[in-house]
């Protein structure tokens, strides 16, 4: 039976903008020069970044969020905090201990998620979310969608950016540009305004914090400096509240709930509610009946948390955003008095205490004109509109979040591209050999701000061979660093005599292999086909129910054996889709005569 709502196979020219968030994700597209938020299939403007991997289906969004309590081992949330990260990273190691689902180390040291014995990369979890957003966009546009702009925290390193691009590829998206979240928010804020001068974008989301200082002038968005913390956000606030409640219950009842996965999941759900409640109220109540059972006696958790009490609990977390803001101002060569506007991005910025801290940092009231949950996706869509030629008179000049350089003699880190350098970028520096008659040189590339190379993130190396054997210091070795607008890097080295270049396109060691990506793409297609089959079956079941509710005089025109099969479908029995679609078509024809 043909589907009247089927998509056109012809891809559209639209480039969708996606905010792949830690807590929620959002998709937007430019229509008539303006960014429009696209609702998902549930009619929501944002989609919870939660994925439930069950026996016979994968759920994403609100459907999945409800499974956190019933299927905590199968339900993955905040996977963005793990993307492009190593399990042995101290931050990651500490964080995963509090997760209800299992994690494991992949063969390259990456942290992966384990569900029912099967391993999933964080990029693959992200791809499940992106696939849902892609389907929502295709339904809205009535076209297949291929190209996208995806945002990342400004302080994401190269590995995390590449892993995000991998997630897009697994979801069937061509990620034409990766842009920083604060920059995207600035685009959404400044495009339809005559805003000029220096602005600060304070972005405190579910898992990350970014601060960016930009200069706006006549459609030019020039990022002057950026700073942040990729492991600071609403998840940390929730965990502080959970710890407070667990400790309080221990003191009152002598029972440690910290070892009970289901109890912790219920408390975390309440912690999120408390956080939201206290953004608009001065008190929030927690009531969790039957939180545990001791000696046959059911225990209940019930207490109130006031706003002042809550602010004391989360104070140290929020105050961690102050120092990055000061550093960003210093790197931009500005004082707080030079900032004309402060934009708030991320759900956490709805908290009165956060707004109070922001006002103290910059000395002005932050702007609340834009929706902090939607601004980033709108900005990404605008960047997509610029790339597609749908939005004119906008120039975006972003910066590199971290320095890039090479290791010198003695393990010293020599920065070639310093952090907050405007990209695209190209820089060449001259180096030489450290020994007489040296014919080979290993050029090791690192990313970071530490003085010694070993303390920074290793990205790869170039082996330059056949250097003319000369006294040390005589050969001239040219090392060139290039960065494209996506913040992806290429390093080229050559000696001045042979002029034979050796280059390294930096594909992060923590990225997925081509084989792994291809496998995940195939699995994604299989799930997509399964989802499509379920959707069609649901539509047929509804059509059968509507048909069987018709009057007797109509239905008696149809063959009884066909009606009998349709009644089985209506009773919830399994059925062959193609056969039932044909029966439905035949019965409709019969009764219309």
Curated annotation (Swiss-Prot):
Q: What is its main location?
A: nucleus
Q: Which UniProt keywords apply?
A: ATP-binding, Chaperone, Nucleotide-binding, Nucleus
Q: Which domain of life is it from?
A: Eukaryota
Methyltransferase found in the keyword field? no
User: Which sequence ranges form a coiled-coil region, renumbered to this chain?
Assistant: none
Q: Name one GO cellular component term.
A: nucleus
GO MF term (any one)? ATP binding
Mind telling me which CDD domains this protein's record contains? ASKHA_NBD_HSP70_DnaK-like
Tell me the compartments it is located in: Nucleus
Q: Which family does it belong to?
A: Belongs to the heat shock protein 70 family.
Q: What does this protein do?
A: May act as a chaperone.
Supply the name of the protein.
Answer: Mitochondrial-type heat shock protein 70
